[in-house]
Amino acid sequence: MEKPFGFVVIDKPSGLTSHDCVNRLRKVFGIRKIGHSGTLDPAVTGVLPIAIGDATRLISYLQGSKAYTGIIQLGATTNTDDMQGEIIESKAWPLITQNDINYLLENFRGEILQKPPIFSSVHIKGERAYKKARKGEKFDLIPKKVTINKLNLISWSQNKGELLVDVDCSTGTYIRSLARDIGDKIGCGGYLKSLRRTKAYNFIENHSVKLPEKSDFYPEEDKPKVLNPNIFFKHLSSFELISEEEIISWRSGRKISFQNNIKRLKVSKNNEVEDSFIHNNNILVLNKENKILGIACLDESFAIKPKVVFNAIG
């Protein structure tokens, strides 16, 4: 039987860690080589891409923003910047209109400096910030640049003090920090009450499936569909190997001549081909059936140089 190869996109339920979902799928497929991309906190639900089999070697080549829908609770701050933490300060939220809030949100659109939550996985002198925070240690985190591509106010409840927002942002953005900072800007504090991820890289909600229930046995028909990885790498240019000789050379780790075969390069909208192609730009290598054979780059001699080779020989 052919080994599974591709991605399963789980609609992560609340209460489980991302690693819990990976462990469940390891039991479902009966293999260890499974890994996720883009950790979600236990309370967060939504799109969790999980690579199956050798597709784990493609994780580092994923690109794209992430999108979320969340509720920001005004009138309090917590030590974790979400509802899982302890309330450390409370203050009544002001009488404020949706137009007022939209005006304030303009401060958080585009490239901004953001300080991560103290309960986060950021490293401080070799130790995770959340471990230091749990021990009661005092420390300060350095703000980092993140990009908020979209920040829309969907609704505002004056009675509940709740903002429902839609966010599209760069990888590494903390929505908890965004909630905290928006609350500070309004002047009453705030924290993230709930969060759902709707997009991660090129994975969207329509790709997602329910996490299989715990079981000692998973019949084939109950296993989630493994999606072809090609559809998630459209940001990469691709090159097709057309002869058996080329494929054997590729699987043996040898370079493939490119200079006379430039017409076989399909350029993604993210790249441009000119007289001098950008060296070391990642290229998806495919066979005639559009199956991924690996990842390559162009070297100085204008040859396709293997970086990731699937089904290697020799």
Swiss-Prot record:
Protein's recorded name: tRNA pseudouridine synthase B
GO terms for MF: RNA binding; tRNA pseudouridine(55) synthase activity
Function: Responsible for synthesis of pseudouridine from uracil-55 in the psi GC loop of transfer RNAs.
This protein's encoding gene: truB
Active site feature: 41
UniProt catalytic activity: uridine(55) in tRNA = pseudouridine(55) in tRNA
The organism's place on the tree of life at top rank: Bacteria
InterPro entries named in the record: PsdUridine_synth_cat_dom_sf (IPR020103), PsdUridine_synth_N (IPR002501), tRNA_psdUridine_synth_TruB (IPR014780), TruB_C (IPR032819)
CDD domains assigned: PseudoU_synth_EcTruB
Organism, scientific name: Prochlorococcus marinus (strain NATL1A)
Cross-referenced SUPFAM superfamilies: Pseudouridine synthase
Any one of the GO BP annotations: mRNA pseudouridine synthesis
Keywords: Isomerase, tRNA processing
